[in-house]
Structure formats: C-alpha cells, structure tokens
Amino acid sequence: MRSPSFSSESSTLVAIASGAALEEVHAAFEVLVRTSGVRPIVVTLGTHPEPGRTDRNRTAVFDGLVPRYLNNAVASLRVSSLPAIGWWRELSTEGLLELSELVDRLILDADDPTTVWQMVPQLSTRTAVSDVRWARLTRWRDLFAQFFDLSEVRERSGTFDRLSITAGDRHSARLLAGWIVSRLPDGKRLEVSMTADDSPAALRSLQLTGGETSLSLRLLPSGVCLETIVDLGGAPPASRVVSTGDQSLAALIGAELRVRSRDRAFEDAVAVAGGIR
C-alpha cells in the first residue's frame, strides 16, 4: 500500500543539524514531505549572521548561521498559520532556548542528550518537549503498560523490586528506566541494573521482577519483533510476539508531528533518568 501524499503543507519543521546527522535529516525530509506535508527547513550553525539560502529538493537550507540569530531566522521563515516544530540534532545548546520560544513543539535528538535533558525543565516552560529516543521507546512503553491490564499483575504492582535492562544505547535505557520508575507505585525503591550490549539495537531486553513475578520484554534476533513474557509463578509463563513497527527516523519524527500536547510522562522520565547511571 502506498503512503499518502500531501499536496498542502501541514506544519513547518525546522531542523538544526550538522555533520553526519545532516544527511539523515535530508533523507527523512524527503519522506516527510510526501507523507506528512511538512514545510522543511534545515539550518546549520556557524559564523554567518545572514547566510545565503539554497534549496535541496523542497527543503530550504541555511548554512553557517550564527546561533544568536537563530530565533530571528526561524521567525522570518515560519508561516503563522502553520504549527512550527523544532528538531534539534546538535550537541551544542547555543540557540536552543531561543528556538524553544518560537516553536509549538521541540524534538530533541542529540547523540549524547545529557546536556539537553538537563534543560528540559526550562524548555518545557516555553513549549512542548519530546525526544526521538522517547518516540523510539513507544512500542516498548505500550507493551510494558499492557502487562498491567492483567489484574494479577496490578495486584502485585507494589512488590516489584528490581529492573534489569540490556541496551546498545545507554541513554535509551536510562530514559526507559526513568519512565518505569516514575510510573510504578514505589518505583523509586527499584534496584535498576543496566547492561551494555554491542548490538546496533538501542534496546535488547528488560525484565521487572519481584517475588515470584517476572515481566519481560526482549527484541528477537530478527530485530523487527518483540516478545513479551509474563511469569506469575506457579503456572507456565505466557508469551506473545509483536512487531516493533516502523522504526525509521522519518516514521519517528512523523509520529512526533502528530502530537501537540505537553508530554509530562516524558518530562518525569527525563527527571528520573538524570539520576540513573
């Protein structure tokens, strides 16, 4: 089935990126223009107060803009009738606060998010904030939450005492752990253990245990399916296999474009993740 094609613009998406991340942004924009109707703009930061504009396919590109002029540039480029979304793929945070005051939603996407996550409380007073890692965790979070649709699991929700996560990306593991700790009753008493994995997958597995109860999620070797396992003790474990869904960068950004409200679950998860090492 072909993806829907948009002939009109639905939002302005401003990506701040550089280096290898820049090509990934352009590749994602080629898809998003067709599937989400975005008005794409790419800005790289540098030393020019008024960089010239070039066009790559349907994307407006501004190379080497001085960070302190970023807010002026975005204000002049955005269309007032369209929501504006910022996509931050820079390690530097210079200009980030100013951008947050001009966009309706800010999507963080730094290789090392430590610094930008520390800014989330400040950013969230200006705009709705999310993160590409958070979007990538959506299927994991949904499946984990479904464990608690079982009355037997809900009855034991206060008994869990250990969370173990194996991950190729430690920051994703911290964010997922932060979400679980912030959402579970007495979550702060969980002993959190993280194990590094050398696979390219951001997450490989998680297990929440307490007494005889074990809740597990693991990525299967195919990399496109997750297995959920519920072991309540005294009975054979129950399992099922579910697709991970489209995990491409364009799909993750597309999902974020459909969200408009403030995401307090993300903010709470980031706050807890800061204390997990």
Walk through the language-model features, giving the residues of each.
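A contiguous, surface-oriented mixed alpha/beta subdomain in the mid-to-C-terminal portion of proteins
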Residues: 125-214
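A short acidic (Asp/Glu
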Residues: 25-26, 96-97, 173-178
